[in-house]
Amino acid sequence: MMQKLKAAVAGICCLFGSSASGNSILEIQTGLRALHQVQDEIARGVPDASQLQNAVLGRLTEIFESSPNSFLSGQEAQSALAELALSGGDRTRMANLIRLSQGSGELEPLLSIVQFYLEADMTKAALAIEEAEGMEDGASGIEHYLALAKGTAWLESDLPKAREAFEQALLDAPGTLVEEVALRRLAVIGLQQKDADLFVRCAILYSRRYAKSPFAPEFWSGFADGIQMVSNSKDI
């Protein structure tokens, strides 16, 4: 665990040692890797990791905001921007940057999903997902984040699709903050659908990996209802 955090700190040091006007996609990608390492430690309950996360999110946002539109509209930059936006970047600032980056390119449909997700317009996000169907090849490296966004967009309108998306996130990103979020949301779906097997599977995996997560209280808040649902549906 400490090795991962040390590696993240090394990446963060490189990020803060760079010029904000350098517009280096390599710097941004290094920063994103460091961010994800820190977030995975947050999910496991490592103290002080949240402060590192906030610093990296702020720095990466500054780099994007100091970049010209010509840089933002490049496919690598668009992909990295979508990744940052879905990784917890400030929603208002991220949505503005995504609007500036749009114009043309393979990632335009996927950027629309991210923009509506950031704006919390899940109806439009769901429509954008339908329009982007079959275009996932352009989202290499951010599939698990898009799976979370898709699942969230479908939560109120299509629980089976939402469940499928969150299950995909579990497969794509085991042992990460993405998995932690997906498990919490799948547990809620298990309760709503009275699916005891799904709830138990999520509860076992969550308790093994994320019991110390700062987000764990949200999971445990529905635990009693889940146990009651399981006891009503199984002989235990």
Regions found by a protein language model. Name each.
Residues 3-11:
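Sec-dependent signal peptide recognition
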Residues 23, 36-39, 68-78, 102-112, ...:
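Generic helix N-cap/helix-start motif at coil->alpha-helix transitions
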Residues 15-19:
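N-terminal signal peptide c-region/cleavage motif recognized by signal peptidases
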Residues 82, 112-116, 150-151, 187, ...:
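Conserved small-residue packing positions in alpha-helical repeats and bundles
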Residues 116-192:
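Glycine- and small hydrophobic-enriched segments that form the cores of compact globular domains
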Residues 47-58, 81-93, 116-130, 154-164, ...:
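Helix-turn-helix repeat elements of alpha-solenoid scaffolds
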Residues 21-107, 111:
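N-terminal leader/linker segments that initiate helical-solenoid repeat arrays
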Residues 63-69, 96-105, 131-140, 167-176, ...:
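Solenoid-like repeat scaffolds
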